Amino acid sequence: MSVSHTITFKDVCFTKNDRPILQKISGTFAAKRITTLVGPSGAGKTTLLKLCNGLLTATAGDIVIGTQSISTIPPTTLRQKVGMALQAAPMINGTVYDNLCLPKKLHNDNLSEQEALRFLEDVHLPASLLHQQARDLSGGQRQRVSIARTLVNAPPILLLDEITSALDHTASLEIEQLITQLNTKYGVTIIWITHNLEQALHVGHDTWVMIDGQLIEAGPSSLLENPQQHATKQFLAGGIR
């Protein structure tokens, strides 16, 4: 296993307004693999994701990327290393090209049209979209542009938060195939929050089950077919929402 792209949680806690959101989370997201995060709403999944790229800071414990504590990595460096795509796929006003240029502009750099076209190709979008207004894109196209924009910094780690939940079945399958291809082609370490348990099973190499801010069970995604923990069985049976 490549050590440099692993993310290790060591007794990580996060508290907000005296309310524990995450409680002593310990575990490792394996490098170059897709780990799906599942659990009921309010389990702390999005909070955990935000801790991975410094949008939030742990109240206690440590998060290590490779061998380096996240607390010692400057935020701009961290966010270049750990990309994030969200359910809403927010776009700035302007063209697809304007959106793809954004990560470079934030670091006083430029993205050529030729480079931008390569990123569109990576996410299976036609070159004709480059100068189209982002507001005119379909939901699936927006999500692909959002992923392409995240890839501009060539992050070895990619965080995905419910990126297919607002898409129809066909568009969701296309995004799943895309993410699997990106993982295979570039060896990107991917952590993917999903409420779709079927998706978690067939897309993920590994799965973490979170309930009430705790990591209940982790292992190969096949655990969703044969869970060991009672709480996981309850969740999968629909007993925990």
List the predicted regions and their residue ranges.
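Conserved ABC ATPase signature
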Residues: Q133-L137, Q141
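H-loop/switch region of ABC-family ATPase nucleotide-binding domains
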Residues: T194-H195
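ABC ATPase NBD Q-loop/coupling interface
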Residues: D62-T77
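Helix-to-loop junction immediately C-terminal to a conserved catalytic motif
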Residues: N53
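Conserved ABC ATPase "signature" region
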Residues: L111-L129
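Catalytic Walker B motif of ABC-type/P-loop ATPase nucleotide-binding domains
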Residues: L158-D161
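C-terminal boundary and immediately downstream tail of ABC-type ATPase nucleotide-binding domains
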Residues: S222-R241
